[in-house]
Amino acid sequence: APSMTTPEPASKRRVVLGEISNNSSAVSGNEDLLCREFEVPKCVAQKKRKRGVKEDVGVDFGEKFDDPQMCSAYVSDVYEYLKQMEMETKRRPMMNYIEQVQKDVTSNMRGVLVDWLVEVSLEYKLLPETLYLAISYVDRYLSVNVLNRQKLQLLGVSSFLIASKYEEIKPKNVADFVDITDNTYSQQEVVKMEADLLKTLKFEMGSPTVKTFLGFIRAVQENPDVPKLKFEFLANYLAELSLLDYGCLEFVPSLIAASVTFLARFTIRPNVNPWSIALQKCSGYKSKDLKECVLLLHDLQMGRRGGSLSAVRDKYKKHKFKCVSTLSPAPEIPESIFNDV
């Protein structure tokens, strides 16, 4: 796909979440974000959760998995175990918690929070795994606890605090996360929310994320005509876009990772079928299983969803990420590419 190379965006002052307001196009609707005058969204019928294909197509990684921490003989077993783990109710957020549980928090507010957390992860140079895990904590907590919008940022930084302890070699301390909120909250408030989070999640802090499954699927992603680094950055970009959209909670992480791979390959080589037998075997998903998620991700990529949430897009405009957010994807995805390979 052609690349529109643009100069790196000028550095901007990090925005404290409380300063963001009236961002009506963040995800959908015309809500005034983080303002007091707001109508509670009407409940909608719960959609059926996408559980992935039930057909056992087998997982075949062969000898291509080059992670020195993983013995290739056990990669398939580990992948299957993680897929079972992602289906456990205790590790999954409700896909419609905004409508069913929350009274004051909206999907737009969630999008603004996630966008801000991406900025925080960049400023503190946190691992991508920390970002994914923190956002999963936010969604799981909000699935069972009603939260006032004034506490949403507190939940975000407390989730980051726990996730950084879980993933980082040198995790940030409480004072760092208080500082990142411009002292909106005290250290005592952050620690109290941390304790509440741990109690709510019953100390089940380890969960497979989209980032987890991307590592497995990339192991069998073969395309000699595409620079490996460019593909990886594009896949990471699309995966982080999925974090912004509340609608992606409908899909399990392994399906999102497979859809990200599908869309990244289509973006780079739109005239070639993006799926293959090898990818189908390793992911456990056929092309048709990915269709709904791929189309949602494509809308995010095109800016038709979450267009005003800029942190992820700005991050991947940088030359060190090969400017992958400036790639021009096809405006529409043909139905034919979802046919079986």
Curated annotation (Swiss-Prot):
Source organism, top-level taxon: Eukaryota
Record carries keyword Plastid: no
Keywords: Cell cycle, Cell division, Cyclin, Mitosis
A Pfam family this chain is assigned to: Cyclin_C
Keyword Aminoacyl-tRNA synthetase (UniProt): no
SMART domains xref list: CYCLIN (SM00385), Cyclin_C (SM01332)
BP term (GO), one: cell division
InterPro entries associated with the record: Cyclin, Cyclin-like_dom, Cyclin-like_sf, Cyclin_C-dom, Cyclin_N, Cyclins_cyclin-box
Family to which this protein belongs: Belongs to the cyclin family. Cyclin AB subfamily.
Function statement: Essential for the control of the cell cycle at the G2/M (mitosis) transition. Interacts with the CDC2 and CDK2 protein kinases to form MPF. G2/M cyclins accumulate steadily during G2 and are abruptly destroyed at mitosis.
Record-given protein name: G2/mitotic-specific cyclin C13-1
Species this protein is from: Daucus carota (Wild carrot)
